[in-house]
């Protein structure tokens, strides 16, 4: 490069020879080459010489402005070696101008060639914008002296680069140690390769959700200490604000490992860095104001035991103590009391009451009254009443937190194979607004017990197995009620469990709003439970995944990455029936067979609701399987004749059209 050429080597100065002796070669008005701070080299006129301090002052004109600077004598001699000795000055030969900067680089002379020139004295001031310099006929390379500051900077830079190299070596060594000791190293490599091809979106780009009667969100927790010790893998990826991907490791017959990537779409998805405040902002917060408009709001956390439900609803744990001020309980209470003081609702003179009870083994217990057993009855107005439930009036957030702490201390918990401190009951905390002693609105915050698979509780005690069966039964009933709420069905199966009976007023009516927070564990050992949770949440509100092509990976076996289906299989709907193609009107007039074909097709389309009725019955909690099968077979036998007749008519119509086309 041009910038690598420097000046002719100056005669080496003897340490005994003072620098002042070289001032004999300097005169005010001569032109010398100087170097700017941006590495440009151009000519300047010497205007002052300080022999005591060994520096000179130079001036030049740049862009119509006269500039100047002080330069040490040693620096000037390095750039002007011809001044170092009178012998060199006397034997100076004529110099020729050479362009050192291309014409296209006017104004930027950082790559200017570092040549020195001695030009006879002129009356004009040299310009810093000049593109040409007069150079000696025999230029040679020289070593430019660096300032102490620059030398220190370079020293620090070398030390920094050395430290970085050492850190990279240490990280590579640690990664190698981890990988060799991790039995799932191949799966981890496939997951990392797949994630590198995904486009992540920032959580800060989230917008408040639309006004839905039901909102389904998913929250992923980080790997806990137990999973990290076991060298478990994080198999959950959240590429955008509403998509969750599960990388399930599978094995082929030839023992080749591959990934089956299952994708789910929800209203919102939160990764392991999301705080409780962020989760609350997009889940329960939009529902708070609805209870001031005589609405019934419900927010519940669902997921595997140990996936973070109680952490989300109640707050973070510090040992066995829970910080309730950071949970959704406290955040809802803060917004309720803030809205209560606004002018729009202050005139209603509303009072706030709090209740806290649990549902364990199909029975209801009051957590604010020493776990007193309660009865759930239906009055003459078909309203569910929890007889004996204690309601305590609260006037601030601190009083609400006291109720939460009191209830959590009495809540039933136990030890499972997954979680040493697992909640074994459904806890329901309610904030009730009353106006003149009458119910105005209610917000139910439900911390559900963890769902469990039978395989996980096979070695558990009989008590734990009965607990798990009762929990799963109530969760199934809750799912059906929420689906009926989301689809505006006329029938809601809330009598299937005590949990749905207690929350009946949250499912019935047009002012009912529900938010579900599905918490999932990221570990590979929890893959089956995570998929069950996501399928449950997906069935609650089936959202179509937006068609977005994710970039495939270029790896072949054994790094095969297969994209699995995203959502759980949808049931057959009446719109899925095969439709008969429409024939042009001219052919309809010419063919009598087509008219007869319309009649069975019409009867088939009119019989669409029968399948929907059977489907709704089969999806119920207490459905009779034998009755559904018998009813379906009976109806299908009746429809077989209709389908056979349609088939014959279509064949005749096709033959007729072929004959006409041949005749033409």
From Swiss-Prot:
<dbReference type="GO" id="GO:0051301">
    <property type="term" value="P:cell division"/>
</dbReference>
<feature type="modified residue" description="Phosphoserine; by PLK1">
    <location>
        <position position="204"/>
    </location>
</feature>
<dbReference type="GO" id="GO:0005871">
    <property type="term" value="C:kinesin complex"/>
</dbReference>
<dbReference type="GO" id="GO:0007018">
    <property type="term" value="P:microtubule-based movement"/>
</dbReference>
<keyword id="KW-0597">Phosphoprotein</keyword>
<keyword id="KW-0132">Cell division</keyword>
<dbReference type="InterPro" id="IPR036961">
    <property type="entry name" value="Kinesin_motor_dom_sf"/>
</dbReference>
<dbReference type="Pfam" id="PF22923">
    <property type="entry name" value="KIF2A-like_1st"/>
</dbReference>
<dbReference type="GO" id="GO:0005813">
    <property type="term" value="C:centrosome"/>
</dbReference>
<feature type="binding site">
    <location>
        <begin position="303"/>
        <end position="310"/>
    </location>
    <ligand>
        <name>ATP</name>
    </ligand>
</feature>
<keyword id="KW-0131">Cell cycle</keyword>
<keyword id="KW-0493">Microtubule</keyword>
<feature type="domain" description="Kinesin motor">
    <location>
        <begin position="213"/>
        <end position="543"/>
    </location>
</feature>
<dbReference type="GO" id="GO:0008017">
    <property type="term" value="F:microtubule binding"/>
</dbReference>
<feature type="coiled-coil region">
    <location>
        <begin position="149"/>
        <end position="177"/>
    </location>
</feature>
<dbReference type="InterPro" id="IPR027640">
    <property type="entry name" value="Kinesin-like_fam"/>
</dbReference>
<keyword id="KW-0137">Centromere</keyword>
<keyword id="KW-0547">Nucleotide-binding</keyword>
<dbReference type="GO" id="GO:0007019">
    <property type="term" value="P:microtubule depolymerization"/>
</dbReference>
<dbReference type="InterPro" id="IPR001752">
    <property type="entry name" value="Kinesin_motor_dom"/>
</dbReference>
<keyword id="KW-0067">ATP-binding</keyword>
<comment type="function">
    <text>Plus end-directed microtubule-dependent motor required for spindle assembly and chromosome movement. Has microtubule depolymerization activity. Plays a role in chromosome congression.</text>
</comment>
<feature type="coiled-coil region">
    <location>
        <begin position="642"/>
        <end position="663"/>
    </location>
</feature>
<protein>
    <recommendedName>
        <fullName>Kinesin-like protein KIF2B</fullName>
    </recommendedName>
</protein>
<keyword id="KW-0158">Chromosome</keyword>
<dbReference type="InterPro" id="IPR019821">
    <property type="entry name" value="Kinesin_motor_CS"/>
</dbReference>
<dbReference type="GO" id="GO:0016887">
    <property type="term" value="F:ATP hydrolysis activity"/>
</dbReference>
<dbReference type="GO" id="GO:0003777">
    <property type="term" value="F:microtubule motor activity"/>
</dbReference>
<dbReference type="GO" id="GO:0005737">
    <property type="term" value="C:cytoplasm"/>
</dbReference>
<dbReference type="GO" id="GO:0000776">
    <property type="term" value="C:kinetochore"/>
</dbReference>
<dbReference type="GO" id="GO:0005819">
    <property type="term" value="C:spindle"/>
</dbReference>
<dbReference type="GO" id="GO:0005524">
    <property type="term" value="F:ATP binding"/>
</dbReference>
<keyword id="KW-0505">Motor protein</keyword>
<keyword id="KW-0175">Coiled coil</keyword>
<dbReference type="InterPro" id="IPR054473">
    <property type="entry name" value="KIF2A-like_N"/>
</dbReference>
<dbReference type="GO" id="GO:0005874">
    <property type="term" value="C:microtubule"/>
</dbReference>
<dbReference type="Pfam" id="PF00225">
    <property type="entry name" value="Kinesin"/>
</dbReference>
<keyword id="KW-0206">Cytoskeleton</keyword>
<dbReference type="GO" id="GO:0051310">
    <property type="term" value="P:metaphase chromosome alignment"/>
</dbReference>
<keyword id="KW-0995">Kinetochore</keyword>
<feature type="region of interest" description="Disordered">
    <location>
        <begin position="583"/>
        <end position="607"/>
    </location>
</feature>
<keyword id="KW-0498">Mitosis</keyword>
């Amino acid at each position: 490069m041009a910038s690598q050429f420097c000046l002719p080597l100056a005669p080496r100065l003897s340490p005994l020879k003072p620098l002042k002796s070289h001032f004999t070669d300097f005169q005010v008005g001569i032109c010398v080459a100087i170097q700017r701070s941006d590495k440009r080299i151009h000519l300047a006129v010497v205007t002052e010489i300080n022999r005591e301090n060994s520096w000179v002052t130079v001036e030049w004109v740049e862009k119509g402005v006269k500039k100047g600077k002080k330069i040490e004598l040693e620096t000037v001699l390095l750039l002007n070696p011809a001044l170092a000795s009178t012998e060199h000055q006397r034997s100076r030969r004529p110099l020729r101008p050479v362009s050192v900067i291309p014409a296209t680089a006017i104004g930027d002379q950082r790559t200017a060639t570092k040549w020195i020139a001695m030009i006879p004295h002129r009356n004009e001031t040299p310009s810093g914008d000049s593109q040409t310099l007069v150079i000696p006929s025999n230029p040679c390379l020289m070593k430019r002296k660096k300032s102490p500051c620059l030398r220190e900077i370079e020293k620090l830079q070398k030390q920094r680069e050395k430290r970085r190299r050492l850190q990279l070596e240490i990280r590579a060594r640690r990664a190698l140690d981890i990988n060799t000791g991790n039995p799932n190293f191949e799966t981890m490599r496939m997951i990392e390769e797949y994630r590198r091809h995904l486009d992540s979106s920032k959580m800060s780009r989230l917008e408040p959700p639309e006004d839905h009667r039901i909102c389904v969100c998913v929250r992923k927790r980080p790997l806990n200490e137990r999973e990290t010790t076991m060298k478990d893998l994080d198999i959950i990826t959240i590429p955008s604000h509403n998509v969750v991907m599960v990388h399930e490791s599978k094995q082929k017959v030839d023992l080749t490992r591959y990934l089956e990537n299952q994708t789910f779409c929800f209203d919102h998805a939160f990764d392991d860095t999301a705080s409780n405040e962020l989760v609350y902002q997009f889940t329960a917060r939009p529902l708070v104001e609805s209870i001031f408009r005589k609405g019934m709001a419900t927010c519940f956390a669902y997921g595997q035991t140990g996936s973070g439900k109680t952490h989300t609803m109640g707050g973070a744990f510090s040992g066995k103590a829970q910080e309730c001020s950071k949970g959704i309980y406290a955040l809802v209470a803060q917004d309720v009391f803030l809205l209560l003081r606004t002018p729009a609702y202050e005139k209603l003179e509303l009072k706030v009451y709090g209740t806290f009870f649990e549902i364990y083994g199909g029975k209801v217990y009051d957590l604010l009254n020493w776990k007193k057993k309660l009865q759930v009855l239906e009055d003459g107005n078909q309203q569910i009443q929890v007889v004996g439930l204690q309601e305590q009036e609260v006037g601030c957030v601190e009083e609400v937190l006291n109720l939460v702490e009191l209830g959590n201390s009495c809540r039933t918990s136990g030890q499972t194979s997954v979680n040493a401190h697992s909640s074994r009951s459904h806890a329901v905390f309610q904030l009730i607004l009353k106006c003149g002693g009458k119910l105005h609105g209610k917000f139910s915050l439900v911390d559900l017990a963890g769902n469990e698979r039978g395989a996980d509780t096979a070695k558990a005690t009989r008590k734990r197995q009965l607990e798990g069966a009762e929990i799963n039964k109530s969760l199934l009933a809750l799912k059906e009620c929420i689906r009926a709420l989301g689809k505006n069905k006329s029938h809601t199966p809330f009598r299937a469990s005590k949990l749905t009976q207690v929350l009946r007023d949250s499912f019935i009516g047009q002012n009912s709003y529900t938010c579900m927070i599905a918490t999932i564990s990221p570990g590979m050992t929890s893959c089956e439970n995570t998929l069950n949770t996501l399928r449950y949440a997906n069935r609650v509100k089936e959202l179509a995944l937006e068609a977005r092509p994710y970039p495939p990976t270029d790896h072949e076996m054994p790094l095969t990455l297969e994209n699995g289906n995203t959502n759980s299989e949808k049931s057959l709907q009446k719109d899925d029936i095969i439709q008969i193609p429409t024939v042009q009107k001219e052919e309809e007039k010419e063919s009598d067979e087509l008219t007869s074909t319309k009649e069975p097709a019409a009867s088939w389309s009119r019989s669409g609701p029968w399948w929907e009725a059977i489907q709704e019955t089969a999806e119920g909690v207490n459905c009779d399987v034998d009755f559904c099968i018998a009813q379906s077979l009976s109806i299908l036998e009746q429809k077989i004749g209709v389908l056979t007749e349609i088939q014959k008519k279509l064949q005749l119509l096709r033959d007729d059209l072929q004959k006409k086309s041949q005749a033409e």
